[in-house]
Design a protein with these regions (language model features):
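Positively charged n-region of N-terminal signal peptides that target proteins for export
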Residues: 1-5
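Short, low-complexity N-terminal intrinsically disordered segments enriched in polar/charged residues
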Residues: 6-47, 51
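Second-shell loop/turn segments in exported
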Residues: 28-33, 43-46, 60-65, 115-119, ...
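Short, well-ordered alpha-helical segments enriched in acidic and aromatic residues
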Residues: 51-68
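Extracytoplasmic/periplasmic proteins that interact with beta-lactams or build/remodel peptidoglycan
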Residues: 77-80, 84-367, 387-411, 419
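Beta-lactam-recognizing serine transpeptidase/beta-lactamase-like catalytic domain environment
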Residues: 324-334, 374-424, 429-657, 665
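Short hydrophobic alpha-helical segments used for membrane anchoring or interfacial signaling
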Residues: 368-373
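Short, gly/Ser/Thr-rich active-site loops of penicillin-recognizing serine hydrolases
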Residues: 670-683
Length: 683
């Protein structure tokens, strides 16, 4: 009997143990299944979160959450906030630690780390997600209890997110004395409030049309093209703050005025091509620069120094992302970056010299450069005709743009950046290299009768022509004073092509000038000399010879510096001093040519006598370059001057005016050069 009980209890214990083992195993499997299913649900949710599939995310929210926020509100909130802070590269990483089991309340909690890039800086934070087991649409699964802190940390119901961009101040461009060439000013945007405009009187609308020079039909079209009922401001014009029309417009029903700061160019037309202008970034520019932090609403340098030094002038924007309560009171700064203002650009340009020269060129098609012949500092780079760059900043109508773009004098063309045939202003170079190579001497004379000459019959009908026959032999001094083409054609032939090219290239032909502004390279030819006629023509600055006004000025600086060409500088920080080219001609040659250039200005028969300023000793050369495609035709003529003051040289000017035929040739420039030197050196 005792044995029987022992067997009974043994069996009972074994069976009971097996029962508990099976129960535990079942319970454990069920719990692990819940944990794994919760993990799977949350992993899916975080993946959709990173992909910004907000509509799909909403389907995984708990029933309780869905009672507090609609799908439309949920999606809209994420889109608006993430869009406002420019969220991208969103990564949500669940932080799973070992086995997961529901708590006593049946819920499961997961921590996660969210990182994202924003327009301010990257954001990273950890959060906690609570999941509940529910049945929705006949599907039992784990769903997320959502709240606003999922969007940004510490965010609560009713809170808002404010994202502000802090725009940098664009660096000023100033001249050598600190005078602003590009700065900022306050302007006023004139806009239509569609709702109020519809109630405005026809008389009032006509007055707006008249004041702003905008057809009433165009104003009506702008309003009708706006379909959004929430639009309260349609910009129609921008005016300077001191514009007298603003007072009248302020009183007009249906209009709204807003102030803003914009780029401003005080010297307007006078510096337009040098300084350039800024404008709204276009799609092509944006695509190239979007990785550098540019936005579609940014302005960007469009031309000139504004474009060349865009990176330095622009700076970088800052911004703030803050959480506020429903009343707008700030609660928490989520991210902040201070704006980095653009760096200033200080030039060697003298704004007063620039303005003076521009006034002399105004109403002509031409260009000029001015330098300090001893230091190489660039004092002026001038272009005419020009345009007011402020018109591009304020906004230009299609009609205004068409008038500017189709102007036959091409005001948008940057002439000082282009190469032109220098004509007789090239002759001092031929003289210098001829003397240096011993191909000519100061005493050598040519004996040619009449106005025309050719080497021999192999030239066919082609002849070199000079302006006057002075009735006798012509030596170097007379050739420069009288500007004799035949003398310099013969001098070039005497040197020969190899020597002519070798010596001329010492002056910097076919090289980029060492300044941070793109200019054409001056050249002696396009693709070598085709024949000796071209060589002869090149001796007096025709043929295929082209020079920029600045390069011509630098070449002439050699006559003020014993045969050395100064190092040019456009930026104050780049003032190098010294020489760009040394010993381009021997000192004795320099002295000889320089004395002849003085006679060009002082001799009663000198071609530059009309520009001489009493009390200022000047050295220079005039030139007339003829532009024609073939012999026999009458081409356009450009008039040139290259001149500097001799004693304590402070100013060297090169100037070219187009189409001077029938107006006196280079003498069109006489009075202009005289006034420039008088104003700059004597007043």
């Amino acid at each position: 009997m005792k044995k029987t009980w022992i067997v009974f209890w043994t069996v009972f214990v074994v069976v009971l143990s097996g029962f508990f083992y099976l129960f535990w195993d079942f319970w454990k499997d069920t719990t692990q299944s819940d944990g794994e299913r919760a993990k799977a649900a949350f992993t899916t949710y975080t993946t959709k979160w990173g992909e910004q599939k907000f509509s799909d995310m909403y389907e995984q929210l708990s029933l309780h959450t869905k009672k507090t926020i609609s799908k439309e509100e949920f999606v809209s909130r994420y889109q608006n906030i993430y869009g406002g802070i420019e969220a991208k590269a969103i990564a949500v990483d669940p932080m799973y630690n070992g086995d997961v089991m529901p708590g006593e309340d049946g819920q499961i909690n997961f921590h996660y780390r969210l990182t994202m890039e924003t327009f301010v800086e990257p954001i990273s934070f950890t959060g906690k997600a609570t999941l509940v087991k529910e049945t929705q649409n006949d599907l039992e699964d784990w769903y997320i209890h959502w709240n606003p802190s999922f969007i940004l940390p510490e965010m609560k119901e009713g809170d808002k997110v404010r994202a502000n961009t802090v725009y940098p101040r664009r660096g000023e461009i100033t001249d050598r004395a600190g005078r602003p060439l590009a700065t900022e000013r306050v302007v006023v945007d004139i806009g239509i409030n569609p709702g109020e405009w519809s109630q405005a009187s026809q008389t009032g609308k006509m007055e707006v049309s008249k004041l702003l020079h905008i057809p009433l039909d165009d104003l009506t079209s702008k309003v009708q093209a706006t379909t959004s009922k929430s639009t309260k401001f349609i910009r129609i014009a921008t005016l300077p703050q001191d514009d007298a029309r603003i007072k009248q417009l302020e009183k007009t029903e249906g209009l709204k005025l807003q102030k803003k700061k914009v780029r401003y160019y005080p010297y307007q037309d006078a510096t337009a091509h040098l300084v350039g202008y800024v404008g709204a970034i276009n799609q092509e520019e944006y695509e190239k620069r979007k990785d550098q932090g540019y936005k579609t609403s940014d302005v960007i340098g469009k031309s000139g120094l504004e474009q060349i030094f865009e990176e330095q002038l622009r700076g970088s924007a800052g911004g703030r992302i803050v959480i506020t309560d429903a009343d707008g009171t700030e609660k928490k700064t989520v991210a902040e970056r201070f704006a980095k203002h653009g760096q200033p650009l200080a030039l060697t340009i003298d704004a007063e010299v620039q303005q003076t020269i521009y006034q002399e060129l105004k109403n002509e098609a031409g260009t000029a450069a001015a330098i300090s012949p001893k230091t190489g500092e660039i004092l002026a780079l001038v272009n005419s005709p020009s345009f007011d760059p402020n018109a591009f900043v304020l906004g230009m109508s299609a009609t205004e743009w068409k008038q500017l773009n189709e102007n036959p004098q091409k005001p948008l063309l940057n002439r000082f950046a282009r190469g032109f045939a220098p004509g007789s202003t090239f002759k001092p170079i031929t003289a210098a290299i001829g003397l240096a190579s011993k191909a000519i001497t100061p005493a050598d004379s040519i004996h040619v009768r009449g106005l025309h000459w050719q080497k021999d019959a192999s030239w066919g009908g082609y002849e070199v022509t000079r302006v006057s026959d002075y009735g006798g032999p012509v030596n170097l001094e007379k050739a420069l004073v009288y500007s004799d083409n035949i003398y310099f054609a013969k001098a070039a032939l005497s040197m020969g092509e190899e020597q002519f090219v070798k010596k001329s290239e010492l002056f910097g032909f076919h090289e980029a000038l060492p300044i941070p502004y793109p200019l054409d390279k001056s050249k002696l030819y396009n693709d070598g000399f085709k024949n000796e006629i071209q060589l002869a023509d090149s001796g007096y600055g025709q043929g295929e010879v082209t020079m920029t006004p600045l390069h011509l000025a630098l070449v002439y600086s050699a006559f003020a510096n014993d045969g050395n060409i100064v190092n040019p500088s456009l930026l104050q920080e780049d003032k190098k001093g010294g020489y760009w080219k040394t010993n381009v001609m021997p000192a004795d040659v320099t002295g000889t040519v320089k004395q002849h250039l003085i006679q060009v200005m002082e001799d009663p028969r000198g071609t530059g006598r009309g520009a001489r300023v009493p009390g200022i000793r000047m050295a220079g050369k005039t030139g007339t370059a003829e532009l024609k495609q073939k012999k026999g035709e009458i081409g356009l003529e450009n008039g040139w001057y290259a001149v500097f003051n001799v004693d304590d040289p402070r100013l060297l000017v090169t100037m070219m005016i187009e189409d001077v035929r029938g107006r006196g040739g280079s003498h069109v420039l006489d009075a202009r050069i005289k006034r420039i030197f008088t104003k700059v050196l004597k007043e």
